[in-house]
Amino acid sequence: MIQQESRLKVADNSGAREVLCIKVLGGSGRKIANIGDVIVCSVKEATPGGVVKKGDVVKAVIVRSKSGVRRNDGSYIKFDENAAVIVRDDKSPRGTRIFGPVARELRDNQFMKIVSLAPEVL
């Protein structure tokens, strides 16, 4: 569960290392986001020479969450960290590589490019 002021690791090579959640998209009073949801973030830490810079406001999709998500068969999938991938408005990633595993729930939300770039889909 990601909410405002949550800090997430960035799991791509867009140049950002860490982002801070500003807003959860999808409804006027929505408070929390989970895997597959799009959030608005501010870049808090970035590598020099990257596509995004520190202080940029970007959209990101959550790919890993500590709280995890329940699947239809009753199982839960949880990760060791909260991580996101920076995306454009058309849901395509800004980076060209994805680091670490991503959840299968991204396929249901039409983030196929992220799923295809990921080294492992759990």
From Swiss-Prot:
GO cellular component: cytosolic large ribosomal subunit
Alphabetical list of Pfam families matching this protein: Ribosomal_L14
Record carries keyword Nucleus: no
UniProt entry tagged with the keyword Cell inner membrane: no
Entry keywords, A to Z: Ribonucleoprotein, Ribosomal protein, RNA-binding, rRNA-binding
CDD domains: Ribosomal_uL14
One GO term (biological process): translation
GO molecular function: large ribosomal subunit rRNA binding; structural constituent of ribosome
Subunit relationships: Part of the 50S ribosomal subunit. Forms a cluster with proteins L3 and L19. In the 70S ribosome, L14 and L19 interact and together make contacts with the 16S rRNA in bridges B5 and B8.
Recorded family membership: Belongs to the universal ribosomal protein uL14 family.
Its biological purpose: Binds to 23S rRNA. Forms part of two intersubunit bridges in the 70S ribosome.
NCBIfam families named in the record: rplN_bact
PANTHER family membership: 50S/60S RIBOSOMAL PROTEIN L14/L23, LARGE RIBOSOMAL SUBUNIT PROTEIN UL14M
Name of this chain's protein: Large ribosomal subunit protein uL14
Species name: Shouchella clausii (strain KSM-K16) (Alkalihalobacillus clausii)
